[in-house]
């Protein structure tokens, strides 16, 4: 999934793909249970992000434009829809040992995942700049320009994703051709070189946007917390709507941070090949990795006013039942 040629090099270098014959019955049942969970999880993610992208995309076409924040969310949802789709294809190509076909989808995964990273980063920066109450002149300058810069930032994400895909495709092609020969010493050295190459590639493409995301979310949480404490100091016995809204925003940001960070950490750990494609834990690892980004998208969906309105229209009975439960509570 993440390491584009990791399984492919192993497959051409003398090892087979995921062989079920080596698993005990207990491990085999474990293997298939998590495979089914991964498929269900991916289907939920596809429906969720597809719904989010469709609603905002339709609004974009209808009104000939979107607010800058919704524009980023629409592009982020589209990239995650593609990411989950490509991840499903990649994993099943690995399962049936179609290594040469997997290379092309792995390059596509690199492109989509890089775009996803940068769109998430732009969203965090946008909300940080728009909502935070810092008084530094540079902050005011960014706040004044950020909305007009969003289309260019999104275009930049596509360019960076394209560069990532070119880099990945180049490394894949060289390594795959070198391992096609019968020289196993060369194949081993090629795997070692590619592992080092891909780790550097992944760290460059993932860590930079994640650091900006982390910084933006922490600054925003600090600003909201400071403002909340100021309101509580001025009105210590008041629990008005504004205080509740700030508290809910802080909780949402905390979950936002935890879920997305878990996705990034599992990706980074996977580069070290803690769990490879031949392991019975492979599907369990995939479930855990993509769970973070699925929950992250859920928060985006539920915190967006347009999405809440669309959900009420699409599922009125569910919303009525939920409101009745709240009244009873």
From Swiss-Prot:
Pfam families: TAS2R. The lineage of its organism: Eukaryota, Metazoa, Chordata, Craniata, Vertebrata. Belongs to the G-protein coupled receptor T2R family. It is found in: Membrane. Glycans are attached at residue 183. The keyword Transmembrane helix applies. The keyword Glycoprotein applies. Residues 49-68, 143-153, 223-251, 304-329 are cytoplasmic. GO terms for molecular function: bitter taste receptor activity; G protein-coupled receptor activity. InterPro entries: TAS2R. The chain crosses the membrane at residues 28-48, 69-89, 122-142, 154-174, 202-222, 252-272, 283-303. It comes from the Eukaryota. This is Taste receptor type 2 member 134. Residues 1-27, 90-121, 175-201, 273-282 are extracellular. Putative taste receptor which may play a role in the perception of bitterness. GO terms for biological process: detection of chemical stimulus involved in sensory perception of bitter taste. It is a multi-pass membrane protein. Several bitter taste receptors are expressed in a single taste receptor cell. CDD domains: 7tm_TAS2R16 (cd15017). GO terms for cellular component: membrane. Keywords: G-protein coupled receptor, Glycoprotein, Membrane, Receptor, Sensory transduction, Taste, Transducer, Transmembrane, Transmembrane helix. Expressed in tongue and gastrointestinal tract.
């Amino acid at each position: 999934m993440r390491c584009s040629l990791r399984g492919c090099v192993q497959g051409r270098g003398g090892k087979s793909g995921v062989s079920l014959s080596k698993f005990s019955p207990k491990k085999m049942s474990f293997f298939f249970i998590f495979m089914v969970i991964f498929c269900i999880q991916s289907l939920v993610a596809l429906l969720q992000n597809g719904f989010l992208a469709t609603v905002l995309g339709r609004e974009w076409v209808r009104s000939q434009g979107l607010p800058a924040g919704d524009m980023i969310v629409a592009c982020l949802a589209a990239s995650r829809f593609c990411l989950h789709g490509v991840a499903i294809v990649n994993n099943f190509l690995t399962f049936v040992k179609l290594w040469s076909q997997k290379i092309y989808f792995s390059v596509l995964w690199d492109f989509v995942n890089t775009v996803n990273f940068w769109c998430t980063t732009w969203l965090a920066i946008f909300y940080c700049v728009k909502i935070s109450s810092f008084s530094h002149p540079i902050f005011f300058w960014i706040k004044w320009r950020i909305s007009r810069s969003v289309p260019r930032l999104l275009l930049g994400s596509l360019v960076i994703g394209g560069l990532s895909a070119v880099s990945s495709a180049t490394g894949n092609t060289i390594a795959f051709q070198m391992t096609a020969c019968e020289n196993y010493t060369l194949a081993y050295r090629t795997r070692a070189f590619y592992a080092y190459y891909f780790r550097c590639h992944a760290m460059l493409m993932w860590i930079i946007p994640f650091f900006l995301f982390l910084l933006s979310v922490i600054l925003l949480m600090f600003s909201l917390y400071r403002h909340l404490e100021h309101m509580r100091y001025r009105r210590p016995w008041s629990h008005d709507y504004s205080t509740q809204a700030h508290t809910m925003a802080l909780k949402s940001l905390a979950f936002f941070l935890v879920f997305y960070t878990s996705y990034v950490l599992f990706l980074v750990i996977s580069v070290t090949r803690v769990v490879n494609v031949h392991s019975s834990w492979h599907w369990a690892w995939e479930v855990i990795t993509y769970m973070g980004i699925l929950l992250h998208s859920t928060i985006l969906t539920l915190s967006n006013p347009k999405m809440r309105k669309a959900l009420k229209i699409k599922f009125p009975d569910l919303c009525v039942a939920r409101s009745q439960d709240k009244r009873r509570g």
